[in-house]
Design a protein with these regions (language model features):
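Extreme N-terminal basic, low-complexity initiation segments
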Residues: 2-11
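Short Gly/Ser/Thr- and charged-rich N-terminal loops/segments
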Residues: 17-23
Length: 213
């Protein structure tokens, strides 16, 4: 991740500096790392450290829209989980489909995005990223992907933004242990903790994906 020793207050957004015209300077606060699948990207913040601790911008809508996607997030969610928990693989069907921006505040997870866009050359493939409270990475998952994560640490605090409100009538999911996906969740099978609902999801080949590229 990008780091720099500096005074945090001197590196916040332009609006914090009254002698600057808004928009006259566009500092870079995030590095975008592409993944093997078109769409999902990893975001690394620019971190400023000194004797007091650290500072970074965890989100800038302007920079996100310029560098990642023209997305407007409307809802923030937070969950706490213990080691071995696996949540997923979830999505919302159109017209309530969701893009997500996820991060870990404490602990570590393996975060997974599965391409379920019919007609995509990477349909059925996935990207897995380790997110931790120390690496401060964020993972952007566009619409058309199923999302899930496994908890690798004793405890995790997980946050994510959504660009569409939760709509239970539009819930969709695929099985976390679908053999065609072959996801290594890095959790022994006898230690995996799932909700009863997540244990009953269908395999990808058995559903008609509502997404098309």
């Amino acid at each position: 991740m990008a780091e720099q020793n500096a005074d945090p207050e001197h590196h916040s957004s332009d609006s914090a500096h009254p002698n600057r015209q808004a928009g006259s300077i566009k500092p870079t606060h995030m590095e975008i790392i592409k993944t093997a699948i078109d769409g999902p990207v990893i975001i690394e913040p620019r971190i400023f450290r000194d004797d007091r601790g650290y500072f970074f911008e965890s989100f800038s809508e302007r920079e996100f829209r310029e560098k990642v996607a023209d997305v407007h997030f409307v809802q923030d969610n937070e969950s706490r989980s213990c080691y071995g928990v696996i949540r997923g693989l979830h999505f919302q069907k159109p017209p309530f489909a969701q893009a997500k921006l996820v991060r870990v505040i404490k602990g570590s997870v393996l975060d997974v995005a599965v391409d379920i866009r019919r007609g995509s050359p990477t349909f059925g493939r996935y990207v897995a990223v380790e997110l931790t409270g120390d690496n401060h990475r964020q993972f952007f998952i566009p619409r058309g992907f199923a999302h899930g994560f496994s908890v690798l640490s004793d405890e995790v605090v997980f946050q994510y933004k959504c660009d569409s409100f939760y709509a239970p009538q539009s819930e969709g999911a695929i099985a976390w242990d679908d053999p065609d996906l072959g996801i290594d969740w890095r959790i022994p099978a006898d230690r995996a903790i799932l909700s009863e609902k997540d244990r009953r999801h269908q395999m990808l080949e058995d559903i008609e994906s509502p997404f098309e590229l």
